[in-house]
């Protein structure tokens, strides 16, 4: 498994962090992608542009069979190198399982409208069926690579 995960800090830490999907979560300043408090957040674009890009490059170098991108959203809106790296990954053959914010954000719209992307909307009504839907799509995608 390649790619990245983003996750909140351990209570009372509200900040958001990023780590490679294949490593344990890290709560270090160099992994912090956004500072949050109860009312607002302050993203650190340079962390996406350095660590985020590095994680995606390492995933390619080590030829991971599946990339995780959890999640893509508004924190990355000024992380142009990271955006470019994500879009390059979409051109590759490696399947990607990602979570994309629904909000209309130009760089996310580029992902949502990409010809290699299949969106699976999740709602309260269908969320119990989503794991089997994802498994079916990934199984089909991985078979194409063999």
What are the residue ranges of the model-derived segments?
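N-terminal phosphate/diphosphate-binding loop that engages ATP/GTP or pyrophosphate donors
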Residues: 1-39
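Phosphate-binding/switch loop-helix module in NTP-utilizing enzymes
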Residues: 36-88
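Generic structural hydrophobic/aromatic packing signal, biased to beta-strands
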Residues: 4, 18, 52, 119-122, ...
């Amino acid at each position: 498994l390649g790619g990245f995960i983003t996750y909140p800090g351990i209570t009372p830490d509200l900040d958001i962090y990023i780590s490679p999907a294949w490593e344990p979560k890290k709560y270090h300043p160099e992994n912090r992608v956004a500072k949050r408090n109860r009312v607002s957040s302050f993203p650190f674009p340079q962390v996406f542009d350095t660590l985020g890009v590095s994680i995606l490059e390492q995933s390619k170098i080590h030829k991971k069979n599946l990339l995780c991108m959890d999640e893509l959203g508004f924190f990355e809106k000024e992380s142009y190198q990271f955006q470019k790296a994500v879009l390059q990954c979409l051109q590759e053959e490696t399947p990607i399982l990602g979570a994309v914010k629904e909000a209309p954000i130009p760089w996310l719209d580029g992902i949502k409208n990409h010809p290699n992307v299949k969106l699976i909307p999740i709602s309260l009504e269908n969320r119990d069926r989503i794991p089997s839907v994802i498994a079916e799509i990934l199984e089909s995608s991985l078979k194409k690579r063999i």
